[in-house]
Structure formats: C-alpha cells, structure tokens
Amino acid sequence: MPLLPSPLGSLSAAATAAPRRAAAAAGLSPLLLRRRAPIAGALLFLSLGAFAGVRSLSSSASARMESTSTTVPSIVVYVTVPNKEAGKRLAGSIISEKLAACVNIVPGIESVYWWEGKVQTDAEELLIIKTRESLLDALTEHVKANHEYDVPEVIALPIKGGNLKYLEWLKNSTRES
C-alpha cells in the first residue's frame, strides 16, 4: 500500500502501519482510510503543530495591545438566560449602565447540567459580553441582581489581543471602574 499524503510531511511505513492495522480491525476500508487520513492529519497539525504559531501570534498581539495606552485589559463574559426576552432585557440594562460595550445574544443553545440532585436539560440563550476586565465585579453583581436564575452563570475569559480599533472602541464605550 502506498504512503498516504499528509499535511505533516512524509511518513514512514512504520508510522502508518499501526493506523492501517487499527482501521482494518475496525472494519474500515483502505479507501475510507485514504479519504480520512488527510483530514486527521490536518486536525493533528492544527491542534498540535500550529499551536506554537498561534501562541506566538497571540503573544505578539498581546504585546501590541499592551504597548499602546489606547486600550485596557478586556474580557469576554458568558451569561446564559432562559429566553430571548430575558436576554434582551439583561443585555439592555448592561449596555445602559455602560458595564459592557457589546452584548451578543446567541439563540437556540441547549444546556445540560447538574441541579438539585439530578441531570437537567433546558433550552437557553447565551449572552456574549465584551467589557473591561476592571468591570467584572460590577457586571457580576448586576447580573446577579437582575437575573431570573438563583445561580446565574457568569464566566469571564481574557481577551489576549485583536483588532486594536475594536478594543479602543470597547474602552471608550464602557465606564471606568
């Protein structure tokens, strides 16, 4: 059997023998393996090989962000809500209070979680909130005071870099801590 092309470069026969044996044991045809190998190789490259490059891009963007005084440390915050009306109401109050520059409302998510001793499943909507890191505590308190849930989700992730003009707009559209 000829070696399969891979985005990672040439592979030795030994390197491809184990996957071929596993595919044969699983009842997969060589044709199916040939079709899937480039996809698997690309996924492997993206998840492992490109990771270092992405990290360096992120680091350089972060360095650019820190080198200018026109931006502030920023975050993305996830908050789930039970329905569209609750999402619009909460998003509007967050923006009115200048606790965030933008809130995206993502409809149609399904959440599976542990609550009151059993697995629960609910249709929800997701708010994706872009704001200053320094406003997280005030935003969290606002969500807790204005949310229908006993324990609302408020999860913050750092923004490591991005479009500097957007990050400047984020800063200028939110209140100072």
Curated annotation (Swiss-Prot):
Superkingdom, taxonomy of origin: Eukaryota
Annotated InterPro entries: Ion_tolerance_CutA, N-reg_PII-like_a/b, N-reg_PII/ATP_PRibTrfase_C
Keyword Signal: no
Keyword Plastid: yes
One Pfam family this sequence matches: CutA1
Keywords carried by this UniProt record: Chloroplast, Plastid, Transit peptide
Transit peptide: 1-60
Subunit structure: Homotrimer.
The protein's name in its UniProt record: Protein CutA 1, chloroplastic
Organism in which the protein naturally occurs: Oryza sativa subsp. japonica
